[in-house]
């Protein structure tokens, strides 16, 4: 018998019947919205055709995905006064990053990143997010 998933206590938007609007995000994130906004601005500067969509998860509530056509670029899980931002990079993108200006940071993050068949998952929050670093990660992802 499967157990029902438990909603995270920090979920910013836990109500499955109410999909959040984008204007509801900044008040929930508080000061955490600043590095996130810089990151999204960097993404849109790299690729102007990026779209976003809200989806619901029984564990984390409503989360937002950023897409280029059907390709998932970023996952944003809003939390109260925080967020979890994740992306998956393939081998070619990681190889490109290891040769670039963020090689040292990439190597450090690779030590704790989760490895999956489709690529390597990098996860950031309010404290660990560097918008310039994530901009380089997104540029590498889009280039491959």
Label the predicted regions.
Residues 1-44, 49-51, 57-58:
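Charge-rich, low-complexity N-terminal segments
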Residues 20, 24, 38, 101, ...:
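Exposed alpha-helical structural elements
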Residues 107-144:
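Well-ordered alpha/beta subsegment
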Residues 56-116:
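Short, conserved beta-strand/beta-arch hydrophobic-aromatic motifs that form part
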Residues 13, 56, 83, 102, ...:
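Phenylalanine-focused residue identity feature
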Residues 52, 65, 120:
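Residue-level signal for functionally critical sites in structured catalytic/ligand-binding pockets
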């Amino acid at each position: 018998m499967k157990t029902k998933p438990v909603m995270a206590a920090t979920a910013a938007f836990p109500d499955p019947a109410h999909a959040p609007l984008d204007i509801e995000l900044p008040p929930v994130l508080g000061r955490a919205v600043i590095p996130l906004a810089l990151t999204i601005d960097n993404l849109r500067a790299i690729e102007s055709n990026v779209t976003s969509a809200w989806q619901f998860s029984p564990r984390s509530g409503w989360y937002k995905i950023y897409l280029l056509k059907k390709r998932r670029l970023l996952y944003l899980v809003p939390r109260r006064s925080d967020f979890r931002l994740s992306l998956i990079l393939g081998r070619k993108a990681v190889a490109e990053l290891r040769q670039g200006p963020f090689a040292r940071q990439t190597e450090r993050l690779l030590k704790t990143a989760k490895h999956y068949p489709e690529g390597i998952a990098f996860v950031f929050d309010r404290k660990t997010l560097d918008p310039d670093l994530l901009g380089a990660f997104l540029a590498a992802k889009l280039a491959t």
